[in-house]
């Protein structure tokens, strides 16, 4: 089936909005407002804080600008849905196509095919006697591409990563944290994405994807019953 142009439409939308605000500002704002909107609805541990931050960002925008960011989120959601059986790093590709690496201290994210190869070399298998999920750590997650590659490899092995895995991803750059959090959320990957310094062990915030937040939701419901 022919793929649509959702990713290209997203890039065009970012460029259009960037005419008056700059590419880096628009892309960074898109990441933050999207990440906080997801977390405000789906992460009960941090919902109040995320909702407050979302409202602070939205209050500074015109209705037209806010609508543009909502459309960008919709386009990203549609793009990830097309790849739900073949997960890939959409935001990382958008970042590179926008040539933002010069403004992000020269950061480059590992291409999908390399991440998939590395994930296959790790050869993740579900032990027959293991009841809990496979836990995988990614200490420098970037846009989440290695986690997405691992999910892809698990899926090819017939392992349901939505039910049989849990990822702990971390990055020192909050923009990378948002990128990873958004994509892992949209792909239904259970994970906590940590804004922190892997070397010094400092942590500043935790972002639980909707699939990871479900146990906390169930616990809240049980307490309220």
Residue ranges and their predicted role:
Residues 205-225:
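SAM/dcSAM-binding transferase cores
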């Amino acid at each position: 089936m022919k793929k649509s142009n959702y990713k290209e439409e997203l890039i065009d939308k970012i460029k259009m909005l960037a005419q008056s605000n700059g590419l880096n500002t628009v892309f960074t704002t898109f990441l933050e407002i999207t990440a906080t909107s997801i977390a405000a609805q789906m992460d009960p541990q941090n919902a109040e804080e995320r909702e407050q931050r979302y409202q602070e960002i939205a209050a500074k925008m015109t209705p037209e600008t806010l609508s543009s960011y909502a459309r960008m989120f919709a386009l990203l959601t549609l793009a990830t849905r097309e790849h739900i059986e073949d997960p890939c790093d959409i935001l990382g590709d958008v970042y590179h196509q926008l040539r933002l690496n010069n403004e992000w201290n020269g950061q480059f994210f590992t291409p999908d095919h390399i991440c998939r190869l590395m994930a296959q070399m790790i050869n993740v298998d579900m032990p027959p006697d293991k009841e809990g999920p496979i836990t995988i750590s990614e200490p420098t997650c970037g846009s989440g591409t290695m986690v997405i590659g691992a999910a892809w490899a698990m899926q090819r092995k017939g392992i349901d990563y939505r039910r049989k895995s849990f990822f702990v991803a971390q990055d020192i750059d909050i923009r990378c944290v948002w990128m990873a959090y958004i994509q892992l959320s949209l792909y239904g990957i259970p994970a906590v994405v940590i804004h922190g310094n892997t070397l010094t062990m400092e942590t500043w915030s935790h972002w639980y994807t909707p699939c990871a937040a479900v146990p906390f939701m169930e616990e809240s419901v049980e307490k309220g019953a």
